Design a protein with these regions (language model features):
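Polytopic transmembrane helical bundles with strong interfacial aromatic enrichment
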Residues: 1-243
Length: 243
């Protein structure tokens, strides 16, 4: 199965119909294992039990940026390579990315209340993630507001690529500015600084949430393809009746 084969919506539907049940099962198993390991992880000597919010917050924060990266690649596919499923992939990913970003903001606020004494600070990292969330909502609104799918796809692709500028700002904001948010402790020069008792559950949860994204994304793409087919049939039927 090549990328050219996957450009065919019918073949894509056939392939994902076989793959999705296995992906869903793997996601459920890894989430269960990750949650179990997270529950057994010890309390931190400074943060206490609050540290366990990290096992939900960090994967969602990672995926909030990763999904926008996926949408940016799909946007290039729309504008440059004219891939038939590129705009489907971008449109299907946006609500999922918005959900991950929302969960990252909420869990970060829940962690910030006992650690910083407030649910919110206009910190560089927090503010840039909030901007990312608003950009997700803006793209979703754009797709719903424009009736012509081709025009909506092109406009959304341009805005997605422009919005990708925010990704390095989010990633390096803790290095560029004096922020309350802690620096990287997993993906960093010199290797992870986190103890294994926290690192292993975190990585399991990160893989589980990544599989969750893949599963939800493929399912959403299938729904979008089928929705467009139904709309096309309805338009054909309406034109026949008008004639």
């Amino acid at each position: 199965m090549t990328l050219i084969d996957l450009a065919n919506p019918t073949r894509f539907l056939m392939l994902t119909a076989r793959v999705l049940p296995w992906l869903a099962a793997a996601t459920a198993i890894l989430l269960a294992v990750g949650l179990y390991q997270s529950a057994l992880a010890p309390d931190d000597y400074q943060q206490g039990a609050t540290v366990k919010i990290m096992f939900i917050h960090v994967p969602n924060a990672w995926l909030s940026m990763f999904v926008w990266g996926v949408m940016s690649i799909a946007s290039l596919g729309t504008l440059v390579w004219r891939h038939p499923l590129a705009d489907v992939a971008a449109k299907a990913a946006a609500p999922i990315g918005a959900a991950f970003t929302f969960l990252a903001l909420v869990t970060g606020s829940l962690w910030g209340r006992p650690m910083w004494g407030t649910y919110w600070e206009w910190d560089a990292r927090l503010t840039s993630v909030l901007i990312l969330f608003l950009m997700y909502l803006g793209l979703i609104a754009l797709w719903r507001a424009v009736d012509d799918p081709s025009r909506a796809a092109r406009a959304a692709a341009v805005l997605t690529l422009v919005g990708a500028i925010n990704l390095p700002i989010i990633k390096f904001s803790v290095d560029w500015w004096n922020t309350l948010h802690q620096g990287a402790s997993v993906i960093r020069m010199g290797g992870p600084s986190m103890d294994r008792s926290f690192l292993i559950p975190l990585l399991v949860m990160a893989v589980a949430f990544s599989l969750l994204f893949v599963t939800l994304h493929l399912a959403a793409m299938r729904n979008e393809i089928l929705r467009r087919r139904v709309r096309s049939l309805q338009m054909m039927q309406a034109s026949k009746q008008a004639a």
